[in-house]
């Protein structure tokens, strides 16, 4: 009889344990968003050429609406202007009842002439921040570094240490005729960043990290391949984000009316195991078309 009571007690304890475990699990939503020139610049506004003009208010309202809709725990930004522009976005979210982000990070570009910078908002505590400006690569007899650098942020979720690397690779615009669409430079950038990540986060250490941002290239391009695999070693995998119609493009170039997938979330094998199935999305709808020429991407991870 004592054995029966013991077994009954054990069976009662199992669902309790499962329930308690589910309560302690932590789901983190990670997003990446190219804000399309959230800064002062010469631009066309409602059909008129305007000099030294800020991002139009209707575009700002649309992107705030997207941030509120997605309500990510961590969101990486590309194409933000100087620090006051990030402060403006943070304050506008607060006064319009958007998501509250206690942690805001702004990273200046490594190139003094570059006006587009990297940034990050986070609801969860930040363990450490590193701003990489010293990643070098050879380029036509010279030594170069990624113009915008790489922003590295470390978190601890439910006892698991993980990192996010935010980047914005070289665009296809270039004045060099010997490097059409800057393909060589972008590949060299990607290779150098990849090697830096491998050195600080060896694959055999089963590191948890994400590489997110605007890669300015297609999924089968050399820059993307550099991040995915070296010989037989898998470094990261692309998380297949899609919109409500199953489409996967993230950038619309209005001049050519072309649609491309330039924005990605790449996850190491241990991080990929934490992906919540079906959570990887691309935000569509009228606000997306108005806020930026890029669409926000996001995915959930369980810790």
Model-derived regions, located:
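Bacterial N-terminal signal peptides that target proteins for export
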Residues: 1-14
